């Protein structure tokens, strides 16, 4: 299968210029620095995925914030110095957020609102203009985690317009596009967009969710004291998922899933792999990881299994997360297994 060259082994810089507690210049200037990029390169990574929220790049009226673009430009420069590539992910745009903690957000409106979409395209025009001269180093991801199943046709339409826009500015840059339902691997097959040699299909994988997000405070249904190991039986994960989330939407419920292990990931990746092969497109996993609350042995086993599938099919990937956000590779909670994590990565 086609590979996303230069983006095979990455890590996310979540929590830096996205998902921050408050708009704080001191935080932006210190959370990620050149030393972090140098360290990431020393670990053998080939790229970083850089989530950025719209309000770092523009004010509420849509006026450009030069210092916000400066963070991206500094990061690109550091990455160039240490031999890393960079994926710019617009984590939130004006009028849309995936964040479950933003309970008043209308997650449908953006997909049917011409004014909101026009602002989205204006911002992306500015981003593309600034980074068009680095087509082999800087890739573009239009928007993080479209939540609702029901907007899939509208999302395909927006993606088609986005690709046309970016191609008019940066014809050789990689564009990384994902499906609905939080960028699920199950919805890659629903993508229906114009393709060329620099389009990449993208998904996120936190399956089984009751394991990777056990005790997650931002999931309203999840008990804070819930714990479960890995691997367990498919039946146990399905039972716990239904008890907690009251649905059967997770990939663990896919037909043909009979056991946990590397075969589980091969099975749930299968439709996405088929779609990518059919369209001659590389496949990429932009987020995957395990919450710090899981036991260490289970974290390692899960990481080994998902990486076995990544490597078998040549799927590029970016671990969530480098620092903090309850998944941080360099955090104290991962210290005792960090070296083993790095060996698997």
Locate each region found by the language model.
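Active-site mouth of glycoside hydrolases
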Residues: 3-174, 179-187, 198, 326, ...
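Active-site region of glycoside hydrolase catalytic domains
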Residues: 7, 112-259, 266, 270-291, ...
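Short conserved micro-motifs at the rims of enzyme active sites and ligand-binding pockets
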Residues: 22, 211-215, 321, 329-330
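Short, surface-exposed loop/helix-turn segments at secondary-structure junctions
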Residues: 27-28, 217-221, 298
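Amphipathic coiled-coil/heptad-repeat helices and related helical stalk/stem segments
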Residues: 33, 268-269, 302
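Short, hinge-like loop/turn segments at secondary-structure boundaries
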Residues: 67, 104-107, 192-195, 218-220, ...
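Aromatic-rich peripheral "rim/lid" segments of glycoside hydrolase catalytic domains that contact
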Residues: 294-345
């Amino acid at each position: 299968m086609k590979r996303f060259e230069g983006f095979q082994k990455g890590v996310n810089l979540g929590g830096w210029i996205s998902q921050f507690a408050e708009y704080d210049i001191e935080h932006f200037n210190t959370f990620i620095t050149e030393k972090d990029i140098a360290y990431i390169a020393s670990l053998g990574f080939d790229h970083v995925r850089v989530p950025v929220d719209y309000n770092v790049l523009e004010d509420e009226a849509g006026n450009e914030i030069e210092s916000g673009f400066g963070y991206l430009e500094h990061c690109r420069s550091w990455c160039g110095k240490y031999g890393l590539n960079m994926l710019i992910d617009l984590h939130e745009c004006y009028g849309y957020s995936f964040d479950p903690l933003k309970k008043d957000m209308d997650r449908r409106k953006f997909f049917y609102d011409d004014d909101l979409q026009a602002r989205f395209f204006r911002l992306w025009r500015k981003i593309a203009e600034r980074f068009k001269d680095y087509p082999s180093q800087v890739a573009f991801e239009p928007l993080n985690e479209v939540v609702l199943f029901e907007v899939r046709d509208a999302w395909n339409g927006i993606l088609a317009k986005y690709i046309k826009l970016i191609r008019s500015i940066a014809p050789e840059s990689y564009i990384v596009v994902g499906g609905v339902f939080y960028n699920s691997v199950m919805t890659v097959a629903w993508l229906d967009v114009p393709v060329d040699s620099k389009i990449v299909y993208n998904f996120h994988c936190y399956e089984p969710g009751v394991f990777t997000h056990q005790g997650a405070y931002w999931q309203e249904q999840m008990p804070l004291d819930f714990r479960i190991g890995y691997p367990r039986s498919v039946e146990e994960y399905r039972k716990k998922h239904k008890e907690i989330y009251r649905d059967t939407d997770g990939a663990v419920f896919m037909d043909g899933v009979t056991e946990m292990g590397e075969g589980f990931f091969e099975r749930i990746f299968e439709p996405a792999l088929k779609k990518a092969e059919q369209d001659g497109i590389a496949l990429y996993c932009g987020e995957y990881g395990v919450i710090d609350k899981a036991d260490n042995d289970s974290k390692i086993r899960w990481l080994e299994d998902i990486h076995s599938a990544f490597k078998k099919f040549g799927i590029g990937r970016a671990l969530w997360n480098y620092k903090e956000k309850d998944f941080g590779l360099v955090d104290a909670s991962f210290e005792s297994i960090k070296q083993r994590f790095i060996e698997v990565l």
